[in-house]
C-alpha cells in the first residue's frame, strides 16, 4: 500500500489519515449504511468475523481489499471482536453530505476496547469487566483496575511478581496495559487483550496531575493513596487510557481506593482453581461455590457476590454486621417481599455509567425510571429492623423528583435508539408537540389531495406515496399515464407505473420534511438535556446502586441460608477451626444420596491432621469443605454445618491435584513442587493449608521423604492449621514424634470382594488403603487383582518383621524393602508345560502312521 496520500483518492486519503492515528486497532469507517474496513484491517476482520473479503476499485494504482458490516447490526460484530480481545475505533460521518466539497468530514467518536466497553450488548452481565494497568519499580509491583461500567477504581501494591500473578488470576481483567520495559511479561502469557504502552504514561508526576484533574482535587491525600507511588503510576496509565478511548468526560470516576492485603484473606491462583470458587476445573461455571451461592436477582448483586467470594475480608465488625442483616431478614421474613422489588431495580450500576458517558439509550432511561420507582418500597421493607440495615437503607436515598422527570419525559415503551425519534413523551415540550402535530397532519392532507386529484384527472389508479430517495410523488399506472395533466412533472419511471410531482405537493413536502427534521433535532436536543438534569445527582445514585447491590447479596445469602439449612458461624481471635457436622456446599447439592457431615477440630495444640483412607473415600471433599466453610464465614455468609467457630486466618493454601503444564514445559511433579514451595515460604501460623497426596510424581522413597519433610516443616516451623492427606502410611507415626499432630481417617468397610465407603471421618489412622478393592471397582481385570494380592501378601509378610522396630501398624516402607530378596511370585500368564509344548509341536498332516503312534505314546508318558 502506497503511503504517499497525494497518490490516493480523496476518500482513501482521508481513511489513511484516520488509520494512521489508530494504527494498532481495527477502524470501522462509516460509509452510508455500512462500516467499512480496508487493506489489512479488512483481511483481519474477514477472518475474525467470517465475513466476505472483497475489493473496492483501486487507489494509488493498487486494488483495495475491503470488508464491511451493516451499521444497524454492528453491535453483534463488536461483541465478537471484543470477546476475542480486539479493539475497534468507530469513525462516523459528522459533516453534511449536501454541503461537503469532497469527502464528507469524518472523525473517530469512540474506541471500543475489551476493558472499557460499556454497551450492554457487549458486556458479560454477571461478571466484572475490568481494564488493568500493571507496573514495577525497584522490586515493587502494582496493579490499578478500573471498571468503566461502575466507576470503581482500585490500586494495590504487591511484594513480588507471584503476588501480581495471583491478583491477575483473581481479577481476570478483560484488558491489561503494561509498560514497554515491564520486566515480568511472562506472567501475561495466558491473557487476551494485552496492550504495550509507552513508559511516559506511567510517570508519577503525570499520573498525579491527571488524577487530581479527574477528581477535581489539589491533592490525593484525602483518598489515602499518596504514599502508594508505584500504584499511582499504574493508575495514571489506566485513567489516561480510559480518557483516550472514551473521548468524553468520565464524571462517574470520582474516587480511588487503595486495597491493602492486610484487609483480606489471601488466596493464590492454585487455591482459587482447586476450590472451584467461580470456575470449575474444566473452565465452566457449573458446580462451583458461586453457582450454589449466587441466586442474586440483580446482575450487579451477582457481580458483588463474586468479588466477596474472591476476596474474603478479615474485618470482624463488618462481618458481624453482614451476619446481623442476614439473620434479621430471615427472622423478620423480609426475603420474599424484598427480592421481587430488587429484581425490578435491574442493573442500575451499569445504566448509571452509560448516563455518565452520555451513551445511555432510551430503554436504559426507562429501566432507570423503573429502578427509582422501587426505592420507596425497598426502604419500607428494610428499615427499622437493625442499625446495620438502617445504615444501608439510608444510603439508598430518595430520587422521587428524578423518577417524576423520567416519567414525564420518556414514553412507556420507547424504541431502542433515539436516532429516529419517537422517544420523548407527548406534553413534555410544547414546541416538540407543535412540530409533531404538523408532521402527523400530513396523513389527512395527503388523503384529501389524492381524492381531489383522482376526481380532477379521472384516473382511478392515481395514488400518492413517499420514499426516502424521491420524497412525495403521484403514481399513475402505465396504462393511464397518457391521461396525466401537463402540469404533472415526471419524477421517476417504473416498469408498470410513472411517478410525478406537482408544485402543491412539492411545497407541502418541504414543509413536512422541515417539520420532521425540526422535530427529530429538537427531540435529540431534549434527550441530551435529560443527561444534564440527571448528572447533578449521579454520585448519589451511584451510592444507591452500591447499597442496592449489597442488599441484594445479603438478601440472597439469607435465602440460601434458609433454603440450604446453613447456620451462623462464630469467630474467635484465637487460631483454630472447630466445625461440627460440616458439609461441602457444592457436593451436597449434586449428590442424590444424603451428604455425610463431618467434624474438624484444629487449634494451637492440634494444628496438623494427617488424613488417611481409601481413594474415593472422600479425603479431598473433606479438606475442600473445611476451606470453603471457612471462606464462606469470612464473606459474611452462613455455612453448611451444625455449628462452626472459625479463628483468625490470613491465607488459605491448597495443594490438591496437579497436571503437566505443557505451555511452560513443567511436569506434574514440577508443578506440584512449585506449589508446595510457595506454601512452605508463605504460610504462617494463621494460614489454613490443605495438602493432598504430595510426592506422587517421583519414586516411592523420594516421594515419601519429601512428604515427611513437608509435613514436619508445617508442624514444627510454620505451625499452620494443616490437613495433610496421604497414602504414605509411614506418616501416621508423626503424632508420636511431633507435638500438635494427630491422625484422622475416612472410614470404609470391606465385604468379600466389595468395598463400601462410609465417608465419615474418624480419629486415628486408617487400617489399610483398600487400593485393590477400589481397583476392582474400576474394572481392573481379575487376574491383575489376583497378582496384586499375591504381591501385597508378600509385602505385608515383610512388613511384620519391621513392625516392632518402627512401631507402625502398617509397617515401614522405608526399611521393608531391604530385609530380603523378593521371592518368585506366580506370573500373571503361566508358563507352558512340557506336555503343552509337545502337543503344540505336533503337525498331524506331516506324520506317518508310525510317527503318530510314537507321538501318542510320548504325550501319554508326559501326562503321567
UniProtKB/Swiss-Prot annotation:
Alphabetical list of CDD domains matching this protein: ABC_MutS1
Entry-linked Gene3D superfamilies: 1.10.1420.10, 6.10.140.430, DNA repair protein MutS, domain I, MutS, connector domain, P-loop containing nucleotide triphosphate hydrolases
Keyword Plastid on entry: no
UniProt superkingdom: Bacteria
Chain sites annotated for binding ATP: 613-620
Keywords, alphabetical: ATP-binding, DNA damage, DNA repair, DNA-binding, Nucleotide-binding
UniProt feature coiled coil, ranges: none
Function: This protein is involved in the repair of mismatches in DNA. It is possible that it carries out the mismatch recognition step. This protein has a weak ATPase activity.
Database matches in NCBIfam families: mutS1, PRK05399.1
HAMAP family in the cross-refs: MutS
Protein name: DNA mismatch repair protein MutS
Organism: Actinobacillus pleuropneumoniae serotype 5b (strain L20)
Gene name linked to the record: mutS
Amino acid at each position: 500500500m502506497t503511503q504517499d496520500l497525494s497518490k490516493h483518492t480523496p476518500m482513501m486519503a482521508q481513511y489513511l489519515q484516520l488509520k494512521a492515528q489508530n494504527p494498532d486497532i481495527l477502524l470501522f469507517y462509516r460509509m452510508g449504511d455500512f462500516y467499512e474496513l480496508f487493506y489489512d484491517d479488512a483481511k483481519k476482520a474477514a477472518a475474525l468475523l467470517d465475513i466476505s473479503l472483497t475489493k473496492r476499485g483501486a487507489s494509488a494504482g493498487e486494488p483495495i481489499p475491503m470488508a464491511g458490516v451493516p451499521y444497524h447490526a454492528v453491535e453483534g460484530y463488536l461483541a465478537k471482536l471484543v470477546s476475542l480481545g480486539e479493539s475497534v475505533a468507530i469513525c462516523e460521518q459528522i459533516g453534511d453530505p449536501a454541503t461537503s466539497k469532497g469527502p464528507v468530514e469524518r472523525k473517530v467518536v469512540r474506541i471500543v476496547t475489551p476493558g472499557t466497553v460499556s454497551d450492554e450488548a457487549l458486556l458479560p452481565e454477571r461478571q466484572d469487566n475490568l481494564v488493568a494497568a500493571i507496573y514495577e519499580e525497584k522490586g515493587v509491583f502494582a496493579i490499578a483496575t478500573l471498571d468503566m461500567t461502575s466507576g470503581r477504581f482500585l490500586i494495590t501494591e504487591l511484594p513480588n511478581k507471584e503476588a501480581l500473578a495471583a491478583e491477575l488470576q483473581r481479577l481476570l481483567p478483560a484488558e491489561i496495559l503494561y509498560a514497554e520495559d515491564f520486566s515480568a511479561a511472562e506472567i501475561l502469557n495466558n491473557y487476551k487483550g494485552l496492550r504495550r504502552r509507552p513508559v511516559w504514561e506511567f510517570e508519577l508526576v503525570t499520573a498525579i496531575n491527571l488524577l487530581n484533574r479527574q477528581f477535581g482535587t489539589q491533592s490525593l491525600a484525602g483518598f489515602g493513596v499518596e504514599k502508594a507511588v508505584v500504584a499511582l503510576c499504574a493508575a495514571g496509565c489506566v485513567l489516561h487510557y480510559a480518557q483516550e478511548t472514551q473521548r468524553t468526560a468520565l464524571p462517574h470516576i470520582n474516587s480511588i481506593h487503595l486495597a491493602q492485603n492486610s484487609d483480606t484473606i489471601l488466596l493464590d491462583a492454585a487455591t482459587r482453581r482447586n476450590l472451584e470458587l467461580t470456575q470449575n476445573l474444566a473452565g465452566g461455571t457449573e458446580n462451583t461455590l458461586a453457582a450454589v451461592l449466587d441466586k442474586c436477582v440483580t446482575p450487579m448483586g451477582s457481580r458483588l457476590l463474586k468479588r466477596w467470594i474472591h476476596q474474603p475480608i478479615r474485618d470482624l465488625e463488618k462481618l458481624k454486621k453482614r451476619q446481623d442483616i442476614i439473620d434479621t431478614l430471615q427472622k423478620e421474613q423480609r426475603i420474599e417481599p424484598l427480592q421481587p422489588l430488587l429484581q425490578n431495580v435491574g442493573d442500575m450500576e451499569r445504566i448509571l455509567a452509560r448516563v455518565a458517558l452520555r451513551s445511555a439509550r432510551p430503554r436504559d432511561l426507562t429501566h432507570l425510571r423503573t429502578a427509582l420507582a422501587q426505592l420507596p418500597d425497598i426502604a419500607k421493607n428494610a428499615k427499622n429492623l437493625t442499625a446495620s440495615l438502617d445504615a444501608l437503607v439510608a444510603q439508598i436515598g430518595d430520587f422521587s423528583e428524578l423518577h417524576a422527570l423520567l416519567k414525564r419525559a420518556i414514553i412507556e415503551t420507547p424504541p431502542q435508539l433515539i436516532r429516529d425519534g419517537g422517544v420523548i413523551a407527548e406534553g413534555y415540550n410544547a414546541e416538540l408537540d407543535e412540530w409533531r402535530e404538523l408532521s402527523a397532519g400530513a396523513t389527512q392532507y395527503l388523503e384529501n389531495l389524492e381524492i381531489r386529484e383522482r376526481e380532477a384527472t379521472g384516473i382511478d389508479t392515481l395514488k400518492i406515496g413517499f420514499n426516502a430517495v424521491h420524497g412525495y410523488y403521484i403514481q399513475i399506472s402505465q396504462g393511464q399515464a397518457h391521461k396525466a395533466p401537463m402540469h404533472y412533472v415526471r419524477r421517476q419511471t417504473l416498469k408498470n407505473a410513472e411517478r410525478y410531482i406537482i408544485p402543491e405537493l412539492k411545497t407541502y413536502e418541504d414543509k413536512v420534511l422541515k417539520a420532521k427534521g425540526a422535530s427529530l433535532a429538537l427531540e435529540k436536543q431534549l434527550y441530551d438535556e435529560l443527561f444534564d438534569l440527571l448528572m447533578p445527582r449521579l454520585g448519589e445514585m451511584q451510592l444507591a446502586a452500591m447499597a442496592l447491590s449489597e442488599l441484594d447479596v445479603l438478601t440472597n445469602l439469607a435465602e440460601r441460608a434458609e433454603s440450604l439449612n446453613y447456620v451462623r458461624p462464630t469467630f474467635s481471635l484465637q487460631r483454630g477451626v472447630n466445625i461440627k457436622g460440616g458439609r461441602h456446599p457444592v457436593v451436597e447439592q449434586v449428590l442424590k444420596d444424603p451428604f455425610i457431615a463431618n467434624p474438624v477440630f484444629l487449634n494451637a495444640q492440634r494444628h496438623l491432621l494427617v488424613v488417611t483412607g481409601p481413594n474415593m473415600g472422600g479425603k479431598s471433599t473433606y479438606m475442600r469443605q473445611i476451606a470453603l466453610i471457612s471462606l464462606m464465614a469470612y464473606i459474611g455468609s452462613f455455612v453448611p454445618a451444625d455449628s462452626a467457630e472459625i479463628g483468625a486466618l490470613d491465607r488459605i493454601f491448597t495443594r490438591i491435584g496437579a497436571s503437566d503444564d505443557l505451555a511452560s514445559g513443567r511436569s506434574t511433579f514440577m508443578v506440584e513442587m512449585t506449589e508446595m514451595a510457595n506454601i512452605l515460604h508463605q504460610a504462617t501460623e494463621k494460614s489454613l493449608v490443605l495438602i493432598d497426596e504430595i510426592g506422587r510424581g517421583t519414586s516411592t522413597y523420594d516421594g515419601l521423604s519429601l512428604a515427611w519433610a513437608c509435613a514436619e516443616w508445617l508442624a514444627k516451623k510454620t505451625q499452620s492449621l494443616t490437613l495433610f492427606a496421604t497414602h504414605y502410611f509411614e506418616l501416621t507415626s508423626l503424632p508420636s514424634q511431633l507435638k500438635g499432630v494427630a491422625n484422622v481417617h475416612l472410614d470404609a468397610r470391606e465385604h468379600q470382594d466389595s468395598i463400601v465407603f462410609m465417608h465419615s471421618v474418624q480419629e486415628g489412622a486408617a487400617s489399610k488403603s483398600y487400593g485393590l478393592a477400589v481397583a476392582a471397582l474400576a474394572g481392573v481385570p481379575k487376574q491383575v487383582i489376583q497378582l496384586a494380592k499375591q504381591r501385597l501378601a508378600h509385602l505385608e509378610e515383610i512388613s511384620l518383621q519391621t513392625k516392632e522396630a518402627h512401631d507402625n501398624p502398617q509397617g515401614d516402607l522405608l526399611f521393608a524393602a531391604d530385609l530380603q530378596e523378593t521371592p518368585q511370585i506366580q506370573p500373571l500368564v503361566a508358563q507352558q508345560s512340557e506336555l503343552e509344548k509337545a502337543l503344540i509341536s505336533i503337525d498331524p498332516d506331516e506324520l506317518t502312521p508310525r510317527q503318530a503312534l510314537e507321538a501318542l505314546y510320548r504325550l501319554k508318558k508326559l501326562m503321567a
